[in-house]
A protein has these predicted regions:
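Positively charged n-region of N-terminal signal peptides that target proteins for export
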Residues: 1-4, 18
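N-terminal signal peptide c-region/cleavage motif recognized by signal peptidases
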Residues: 13-14
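Short, conserved micro-motifs composed of acidic
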Residues: 19-287
Length: 287
């Protein structure tokens, strides 16, 4: 019996040790800070090949009618390194919204958009939470609706839609999680229906687990606070149960988050390098 037990322990230990981050993350990437402003730049999401959308507050061209600039969306062209305001025309009332847009995600055919924005009323704790909005784009019109599971007392942020599995990931501080903000998911049923929201247990911890994204192989990436180092980026490999911290250069002494695989040659993330500093956006490209 002792021999069998020892063999089982050896097998389990071997499985844990064999688990690793995807091979392409150990390639020789060149780091470049591509967006550095006096604003907070974050919320990176892939739009199409060679383009990504991100969030920023206070950039030139944004409305400054408020004492604190609102968060809005911008487009980055990897080929030209140019930033331009993201065209929100046709996205229901999003263009006219005076409130902050927290982050956004697109289906691969760009016919479905999921975004977080703050509500217009305070909740029972006295702060204004974020809600998730679904935008379905037709040829001549678009339809916007608040996701049916949203409770106005809690925040729902950082959506990521995986077209391959028709699954929407997001973070929320709603009750029932492990603590702080947890990562949740729901699967699409038909055109307008969604499954019951589920907690992504293997990824979550008693701390804030934030900015979920997937790569083409369905490996999950997210960030959580680690001691005095700030936010670190973790990977939950497809089929695994234990998240792994990414190797350098993706994690640094500072806040590293919003890891987005544009393709296997280009990875984008947000980083706060200095305490109380602004977040900038970095590009990692293969040599």
């Amino acid at each position: 019996m002792r021999v069998i037990f020892a063999v089982l322990l050896s097998i389990i230990a071997g499985q844990v040790l064999a688990q690793d981050v995807p091979d392409f993350l150990r390639s020789n990437y060149v780091e470049r800070r591509i967006i550095k402003t006096s604003s907070d730049d974050f919320g990176v999401t892939r739009l199409a090949k060679g383009y990504f959308v991100f969030c920023s507050n206070g950039r030139k061209g944004m409305a400054r009618a408020f004492s604190k600039p609102k968060v809005d969306l911008f487009l980055y062209d990897l080929a030209t390194n140019k930033v331009s305001p993201f065209d929100k025309s046709g996205l229901c009332d999003i263009e006219k919204s005076k409130y902050n847009i927290g982050s956004i995600s697109f289906s691969s055919d760009l016919k479905n958009v999921f975004l977080s924005r703050n509500r217009d009323l305070k909740n029972y704790e006295g702060y204004i939470p974020f809600e998730l909005v679904q935008v379905d784009i037709e040829e001549q019109k678009s339809e916007c609706s608040i996701m049916s599971f949203v409770n106005s007392d809690y925040s729902y942020q950082q959506p990521f839609y995986d077209t391959k599995t028709e699954t929407l990931f997001f973070v929320s501080n709603m009750p029932g999680g492990k603590g702080g903000y947890d990562i949740y998911f729901t699967r699409r049923i038909g055109k307008f229906g969604w499954s019951a929201v589920q907690n992504l247990e293997y990824a979550n911890s008693p701390y804030d687990d934030l900015f979920p994204t997937l790569d083409a192989e369905s490996n999950l990436y997210f960030s959580r606070p680690v001691d005095a180092r700030g936010l670190e980026i973790f990977c939950l490999p497809n089929g695994a149960r234990i998240p792994l911290a990414l190797p350098g250069p993706f994690n640094t002494v500072g806040d590293d988050f919003n890891f987005s695989v544009i393709d296997k040659r280009n990875i984008v993330l947000a980083r706060v390098s200095k305490r109380n500093g602004n977040s900038d956006i970095f590009l990692y490209s293969l040599k």
